[in-house]
């Protein structure tokens, strides 16, 4: 199962994590050493991007402190998912949050799990989104369009 989240929201979340770990690594050498030792190199001063096909070219000249960097990363990651989606169950993050009970039922069915007695418990884990939309003006609109098209393709192929 692969959750697919709105690309700008997802990229903004990744950027927040990167900035969070930049601050933690600068403040506490133990955190940086610990994250290195356990192989968490996704964010902060230790950041090493996963080598998705075409990512190096996409990230050339991009700053990891920018939303565009993480949008490029999102596109490369989910292009890889799209190319290998056979056997994957794609699930819209937003649909899980807005209609947890229905989506939980569909997910359990897709996973061939008899969860009829636990459906309410399972669906309770998916909290509705706050009604407020966030604005992210600091990104390339054409990059957003590319990411949105991929997002729609993936969500359409999902449950």
PLM regions and their residue ranges:
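Conserved phosphate-donor/acceptor-positioning beta-strand/loop module used by diverse small-molecule
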Residues: 1-17
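PAPS-dependent sulfotransferases, especially Golgi type II membrane carbohydrate sulfotransferases
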Residues: 19, 23-159
């Amino acid at each position: 199962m692969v959750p697919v989240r709105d690309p700008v929201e997802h990229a903004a979340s990744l950027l927040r994590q990167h900035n969070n770990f930049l601050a933690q690594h600068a403040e506490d050498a133990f955190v940086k050493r610990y994250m290195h030792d356990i192989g968490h190199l996704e964010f902060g001063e230790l950041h090493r991007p996963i080598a998705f096909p075409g990512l190096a070219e996409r990230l050339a000249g991009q700053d990891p402190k920018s939303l565009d960097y993480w949008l490029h990363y999102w596109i490369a990651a989910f292009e890889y998912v799209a190319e290998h989606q056979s056997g994957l169950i794609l699930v819209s993050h937003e649909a899980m949050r807005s209609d947890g009970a229905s989506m939980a039922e569909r997910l359990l069915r897709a996973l061939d799990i008899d969860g009829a007695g636990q459906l309410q418990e399972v669906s309770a884990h998916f909290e509705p989104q706050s009604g407020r939309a966030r604005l992210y003006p600091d990104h390339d609109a054409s990059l957003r369009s590319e990411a949105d098209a991929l997002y729609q393709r993936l969500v359409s192929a999902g449950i």
